[in-house]
Amino acid sequence: MLLAAAPLVAQKPTPKRSPPPAARADTATRRSDSTAAPKDSLTRFLESFSFRNLGPAAYSGRVTALAVPRTGGYSKTFYIGAAGGGVWKTSNGGITWQSVSEGLGVQTIGDLAVAPSDTNVVWAGTGEKNSLRSQWWGDGVYKSNDGGRKWTNMGLKDTRSIGRVVIHPTNPDIVYIAALGHLWGTNPERGVFKTTDGGKTWAKVLFVDDTTGFVDLEMDPSNPEVLYAAAWHRLRWGGSHMQGVGKGSGLYKTTDGGKTWTRLTDPARKNGLPTERLGRIGLAVATQDPKIVYATVQVDRGVTDPLQGRYGGVFRSSDGGATWSQVNDLQAIPHYYYDDIFIDPGNPDHVWTVSPSLLESKDGGKSFAPDSMHLVHGDYHALWIDPGDPQHLIVGNDGGVYVSRDGGKAWEHMAIPIGQFYTVIVDSSLTPYQICGGLQDNGVWCGPSRTRDTLGITDGDWYPVNGGDGMWVQIPANDPYTVYSGWQYGHLSRLDLKTWQRDDITPLALDAGQDSGYPYNWGWTTPILVSQHDATVLYLGANHLIRMTHRGDDWDVLGPDMTRASREHPAPEVAHTSYHAVFTIAESPRSKDVLWTGSDDGLVWVTRDGGKTWAEVSASFPKGAPTDCWVATIAASYHVESRAYLVYDCHHRDDYGPHVYRTEDLGKTWVEIGKGLPSDQGSLTVFEDPVNQRLLWVGTATGAYVTLDGGKSWRRLGKNLPNVPVESMALSFAQRDLVVSTHGRGVWVTNVGPLEQMTDTLLAEPIHLFDVAPAYQYRPRDTYPDWGSGPFVAPNPPRGAVITYYLKEMEPDGVKLVVTTAAGDTIRHLTGPGYPGVQRVTWDLTRDKPRPRELGGPTSRDDLKRVASGQYVVRLSLRKRQLERRIDVQDWPADRLGRLH
């Protein structure tokens, strides 16, 4: 089962100093438990659901920032910032890592900085600067005074994206912020900001226009009054590639701490820098000789395809920016994704730049050579060079963090679970169920929901089934050996897990008059859906809906063009990312003939006869509905054939509100049901429970939300799920586990069986005993790894049967439970906590006393205490009430797929 989840304004290049009224920092202090408002029963109930993070971390995710305290020697402490996974810290040189960003409102990081004069002071700028099609928005800048343990939001919330944070070398209260502003729209809160009071107030000291922000900012290490700032005109529109060049882009310098600025790319200066059609600029100032400044400059001379030629390159100044010379025409492509340059602190001629490869120059940028990056992921974004040892390097790329201690000849990967999942499914035909999902630039991976190992679930338990940018994946319910998976722009393969035979089944030209190749318009993420009614049929979304039969060997097109491509929204300048494509597909679990599609430009179609005829129902939404946004998810109801749920994701239109709808009549009318969701976290996916039709889940840009009343009210689910985008959800039918994929912190799992059993009256009852999920009996497999402390290990769920009950009031003596055989023989006594709310007790599938030995049977005490598979009953007695539930104990299944546990 798989569920998914404006015209440009004229530019004014003249910089304007426009300090606005002082902006106050949002302290966001948390009340202590003694003063907090009392929690209602439902809040306590929902907070009791704790998620397990399964990773994986074999490949991590995009790392955008590195920050290492200046200690005067080798630093064992450093921080990394992830595109979607928050801030992580190591205090032992990278052996182990700890997430320190749970106090942040979002987990997308643009830059990090540690105060040189006080290494406890750490700043985090939220909102990635790389302007990727799948990036998320920030909510300003945060400050920690205790090395990342606690954070305070210091304002600038509407900047949405931070390019650089620069801290004064001797005064930690003086901080500069290079803010890019909104990626998907125009806004005035962008530019260079300065605080002199530690972030309590801010002044905007440099501003160009409401489409131009600042992507880089560098300080002269010998004079903190001298700074260089790189302005970047950028704007994405809808689903397209961005417009990344414009009159606002340029290079600026101040010599008085931001009071006045000089535009170094002014054509009148004739100083050797390019001055027209500028794009992204990266900057670096030499530590040993601060008069030496490098700039990587993107220049577009009218080329409309960003993957083709660009004119610009690496420029160097030896006089503090007065004059420049082009030393190399090297430019990383595409420029919206890379453009930073780094200088060896001990040698201004030793320069590194990032691109799909890590490039090194030893002659001042005249020539670059790719570093030896064997067995290292590509696409680089951050680099730190040890001032005391230039052989010691740390890099951040799309695969995570790597450390080298020999100048880049060999690298060590840091295991940090910051994977950026687009989709997730569960394969319930295997027991325990398997989880598969596609990750940004890290392929498609599958792994177990639990193992027999006492250690837990390791990265070795996961296995890749595809490469590239991992997208959608499907496994037929009746064939766990076949995996269909896709990668960017419509590519599709079929993998046989028994033989590892892979077949490319991407649809090519259908008509004799068409050229071979890809005649359809594929989106970046192409949806794939295996029919619930016929496992040999797949559906694939392009600008048409494509039906694939015979396991993908044949295909035909169902219906018309299901996008606005032929009607409106012409692709804007520099349109690289494909647009006008089906983004979500749904099939009714109750009828194979009812199919839905939703496109990335807002169209919704439905058929009730298997695709013979279609109705476009986009105009049926209530007035004010954002019907030109991405249709992120359509979920057909498990309970009513004519019912469906729909989510619009509008952040690509600079709209960050939730947009969730329901239809009861195949799209003829729709009602909005997302009004109780947070107003600034968007909406990404919706999921209807197959047991309880009033139970819905929604994924937002900062977590998962649940409604128990069909959408009238919403609550956040769980306490420990990070504030991270939830793009997809799936449910294990046997275990009643909700599997959540996040775009930045990997996969998370929680059991939602008690939620499915919720009723209006349950919370008013003094006590309730919930149904118990099947439990597995097995001998734990002891593992004795000697690989050290570094590898990531995810916890298994508790071994045994998890018994869940609800108490309305405190029971000082706790709760007594008894386990019996189906025949009524008592075999185990248990005691559970008596606190109000939802409580859990795990029966470890053993008896109170070992059973008698039998001839030829087991002899160890552990084996004699262990119960056999079969039916058992748990009974809870309290205050003259007695409740009982069945427990199904199953043997651990035979290993049907040899590589799985």
Where are the regions that the model predicts?
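Sec-dependent N-terminal signal peptides
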Residues: 1-11
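Beta-propeller blade termini and top-face loops
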Residues: 12-791, 798-801, 806, 810
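Beta-strand-rich binding/interaction modules
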Residues: 493-495, 803-804, 811-824, 828-829, ...
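Residue-level recognition of well-ordered beta-strand positions that form the cores
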Residues: 529, 804-806, 818, 844, ...
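Glycine-centered tight-turn motifs at strand-turn-strand junctions
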Residues: 627, 826-866
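C-terminal tail/sorting-segment detector
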Residues: 878-901
